[in-house]
Amino acid sequence: MAKIQLNGKKVVIKSNFSLFDLLKKYKLVNKKVAIEHNGKIIQKINFKNKLLKNNDKIEIVHFIGGG
């Protein structure tokens, strides 16, 4: 288990949890999102490879249309 900070809230996740797993957990896989991992923007192609560790800080922004 690991404790991370997700959009300012403390969250406990399983070991070997990737950014993609986090998106699945919050039902954001098919949404347009930007993810910041410890202050760096992560490209979508790296979501499955980027494993989360204890004390990581994650910010997820998803875009919604409107008019």
Which positions does each model-derived feature cover?
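Eukaryote-biased recognition of intrinsically disordered, low-complexity regulatory segments
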Residues: 1-9
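Short amphipathic, charge-patterned alpha-helical segments
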Residues: 18-27
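Short, basic/aromatic beta-hairpin or loop at an interaction surface
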Residues: 27-38
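Short acidic beta-strand-loop surface patches of small beta-rich interaction domains
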Residues: 36-49
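Loop/turn positions that initiate beta-strands
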Residues: 55-58
